[in-house]
Amino acid sequence: MTVNSKRIPFGKPMLEAFCMDPEYTNLNSSSCGSWPKVVSKQIRDYWSLLEAQPDLFSEFSQGLVLQEARIGLAHLVHAAVSECVLVSNVTTGIFTVLYNQAFEERDVVVTLSTTYGAIDHGITSLAETRPFKTRRVEFELPTTGQKIVSQFETAMAQIRADGLRPRLAILETIVSIPAVRMPFEDLLRVCQKEGIMTLVDGAHSVGQFEVNLQELQPDFFVSDCHKWLFVPRPCAVLYVAERNQHMMRSVIPTSFGFIPKNGNSRLPLWSQMVSASETASSFETLFAYTATSDYMPHLCIPAALRFRRDVCGGEAAIYEYIKWLAKEGGDKIADILQTEVLEEPGLGAGVDGQMRNCGIVTVRLPLAIATGPSTAPAHVPGGALTEKEVGPAVRYLTKALAERYKTWIPIIDYRGWIWARLCAQVYLEVSDFEMAGNSLKVICEEILNREMGQ
């Protein structure tokens, strides 16, 4: 099969086009992702070319393909090519942006209670040596997008009342876990109205739903490509609006593209970066080379985009299918477990909430935690788990899923319950979610019967 083959139907037929063990059910695209066999062949071919003539490939061929990759990604996210550069992952992209900010004492970096842990740690680390403060907007799920926006506005007003300036807000498109789609479009509009710069963590965005940066107009945006775009890991795209590119003084680590304030960038005379820099902006040149790095995943972006177009039927078809499958599959699991899906409270029958407008779904398991808030019922069949039992229960559950059912599902304890996150994908179908639901039911019953040690 080549990328020019006719379209393959979604579901089980599509699985044959991917590299996974047919006995393995990948319900966790939002962590490691997956890629087709043609992309796997592409990366091996590039490795062979690199090893056959290392310097010639690096200097003359690699840059051309990387430029093609940037052009493809820019078209995908509706942005100028000059605003899109390649980085290894979202964490690197976000920290690079933060590292380049000239913070002042009264500046505040705003995060949400759902901000990804690695980003939280990075901000805390940077705050130890930089003159800025942090504030977190607290809220609990489930809730509504309207309430999140309202709490955000209230928090911004309080920051200003304290004599501080909300300088930069880190917003998410989709919360990692428990996974829901955030009202990031509305939050962006609030920030733009109030003059707050925005850094959008779109880790789970590109390849899962349409991203239109021309319409959204964030200051900074970064998304992994290896989660949903069928690109080998690690690979991500960093968008910096042209109006903000003067802020980006250095990559991490600082390399040849750096331009000192009192001089010019000193590129090696023999490097193809010299000729490239004649047409590229200083921002593009800055990211053209960052020490000795593995660019192989980035080189596969064009092949992945062709596969999505020619074999999958295009981006719109992919988005529609995985959104539908996450909805149907999540509802199926909740029905099997007699629980619920995480979404806005109080939705009427047949009403789709915005928080499920994506290809990921979070389902509550029938495992309550005794010390949880009042959201947990007074009685759960088998008895609620004690705090000491939660860790062993989660480990037992994930190990049983892996060993018995050949799958992996991220599990989290949240607000007095245990929850599971599942991802739809083009090679999955409702029967895969049904399998997951039945498997979770069996294992949860074992946990409630305290059979974990048997």
From Swiss-Prot:
It is an enzyme of class 4 (lyase). Its cofactor is pyridoxal 5'-phosphate. It holds the Pfam family Aminotran_5. Pathway: Alkaloid biosynthesis. GO terms for biological process: alkaloid metabolic process. Loline alkaloids show broad-spectrum anti-insect activity, and different lolines may have different biological activities. In vitro tests of NFL, NAL, NML, and semisynthetic loline derivatives with long carbon-chain acylations on the 1-amine have shown that many are effective against both fall armyworm larvae and European corn borer larvae, but the effects seem to differ depending on the modifications. N-Formylloline reduces the weight gain of fall armyworms by deterring feeding, and does not significantly affect corn borers. The modification N6-(pyridoxal phosphate)lysine is found at K227. Gene3D superfamilies: Aspartate Aminotransferase, domain 1, Type I PLP-dependent aspartate aminotransferase-like (Major domain). InterPro entries: Aminotrans_V_dom, PyrdxlP-dep_Trfase, PyrdxlP-dep_Trfase_major, PyrdxlP-dep_Trfase_small. Induction: Expression is induced in loline alkaloid-producing cultures as well as in planta. One of its GO terms (molecular function) is lyase activity. Belongs to the class-V pyridoxal-phosphate-dependent aminotransferase family. L-cysteine desulfhydrase-like protein; part of the gene cluster that mediates the biosynthesis of loline alkaloids, potent insecticidal agents composed of a pyrrolizidine ring system and an uncommon ether bridge linking carbons 2 and 7. Lolines are structurally differentiated by the various modifications of the L-amino group and include norloline, loline, N-methylloline, N-acetylloline, N-acetylnorloline, and N-formylloline. This is L-cysteine desulfhydrase-like protein lolT1. It comes from Epichloe uncinata (Endophyte fungus).
